[in-house]
């Protein structure tokens, strides 16, 4: 068996300082994202669970854009809503499909007359 000598990484003081600064910046970004999530969940009365919650959130988006007097950047404000809206839409699409264990094909379980749904599998 071949053994290798242990390797050491030698960093200058500037390298260490740069790494520490990067780590602190990442921690701050993570904390900011956590605080944003808490803020928007509190503002919307909790996390989104259904399509009715999604509709309520879209109303909140319009209200917040009309009277946004605080210093929060509107792009950051909207990106959080867009993430939630995309999540709800994705969940709705997944809930409308189920995987058949017999034939391993997807079949839509609801809204069979939706001609614009790209995920709708039409049986021939």
UniProtKB/Swiss-Prot annotation:
<feature type="modified residue" description="Phosphoserine">
    <location>
        <position position="12"/>
    </location>
</feature>
<dbReference type="InterPro" id="IPR018860">
    <property type="entry name" value="APC_suCDC26"/>
</dbReference>
<keyword id="KW-0132">Cell division</keyword>
<keyword id="KW-0597">Phosphoprotein</keyword>
<feature type="region of interest" description="Disordered">
    <location>
        <begin position="99"/>
        <end position="124"/>
    </location>
</feature>
<dbReference type="Pfam" id="PF10471">
    <property type="entry name" value="ANAPC_CDC26"/>
</dbReference>
<comment type="subunit">
    <text>The APC/C is composed of at least 13 subunits that stay tightly associated throughout the cell cycle: APC1, APC2, APC4, APC5, APC9, APC11, CDC16, CDC23, CDC26, CDC27, DOC1, MND2 and SWM1. CDC26 is required to tether the essential subunits APC9, CDC27 and CDC16 to the complex.</text>
</comment>
<keyword id="KW-0833">Ubl conjugation pathway</keyword>
<feature type="compositionally biased region" description="Polar residues">
    <location>
        <begin position="47"/>
        <end position="59"/>
    </location>
</feature>
<dbReference type="GO" id="GO:0005680">
    <property type="term" value="C:anaphase-promoting complex"/>
</dbReference>
<feature type="region of interest" description="Disordered">
    <location>
        <begin position="40"/>
        <end position="87"/>
    </location>
</feature>
<dbReference type="GO" id="GO:0016567">
    <property type="term" value="P:protein ubiquitination"/>
</dbReference>
<comment type="pathway">
    <text>Protein modification; protein ubiquitination.</text>
</comment>
<keyword id="KW-0131">Cell cycle</keyword>
<dbReference type="GO" id="GO:0051445">
    <property type="term" value="P:regulation of meiotic cell cycle"/>
</dbReference>
<dbReference type="GO" id="GO:0051301">
    <property type="term" value="P:cell division"/>
</dbReference>
<dbReference type="GO" id="GO:0005829">
    <property type="term" value="C:cytosol"/>
</dbReference>
<feature type="compositionally biased region" description="Acidic residues">
    <location>
        <begin position="64"/>
        <end position="78"/>
    </location>
</feature>
<keyword id="KW-0539">Nucleus</keyword>
<dbReference type="GO" id="GO:0006325">
    <property type="term" value="P:chromatin organization"/>
</dbReference>
<comment type="function">
    <text>Component of the anaphase promoting complex/cyclosome (APC/C), a cell cycle-regulated E3 ubiquitin-protein ligase complex that controls progression through mitosis and the G1 phase of the cell cycle. The APC/C is thought to confer substrate specificity and, in the presence of ubiquitin-conjugating E2 enzymes, it catalyzes the formation of protein-ubiquitin conjugates that are subsequently degraded by the 26S proteasome.</text>
</comment>
<dbReference type="GO" id="GO:0031145">
    <property type="term" value="P:anaphase-promoting complex-dependent catabolic process"/>
</dbReference>
<feature type="compositionally biased region" description="Polar residues">
    <location>
        <begin position="99"/>
        <end position="116"/>
    </location>
</feature>
<dbReference type="GO" id="GO:0007346">
    <property type="term" value="P:regulation of mitotic cell cycle"/>
</dbReference>
<protein>
    <recommendedName>
        <fullName>Anaphase-promoting complex subunit CDC26</fullName>
    </recommendedName>
</protein>
<comment type="similarity">
    <text>Belongs to the CDC26 family.</text>
</comment>
<keyword id="KW-0498">Mitosis</keyword>
<dbReference type="GO" id="GO:0005634">
    <property type="term" value="C:nucleus"/>
</dbReference>
């Amino acid at each position: 068996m071949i053994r290798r000598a242990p390797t050491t990484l030698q960093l200058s003081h500037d390298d260490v300082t740069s790494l520490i600064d990067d780590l602190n910046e990442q921690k701050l970004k993570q904390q900011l994202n956590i605080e944003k999530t808490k803020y928007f969940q509190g503002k919307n009365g909790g996390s989104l669970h259904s399509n009715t919650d999604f509709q309520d959130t879209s109303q909140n988006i319009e209200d917040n854009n009309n009277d946004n007097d605080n210093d929060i950047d509107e792009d950051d404000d909207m990106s959080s809503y867009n993430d939630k809206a995309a999540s709800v839409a994705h969940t709705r699409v997944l809930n409308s499909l189920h995987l058949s264990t017999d034939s391993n094909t997807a079949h839509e379980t609801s809204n069979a007359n939706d001609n614009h749904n790209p995920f709708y599998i039409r049986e021939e």
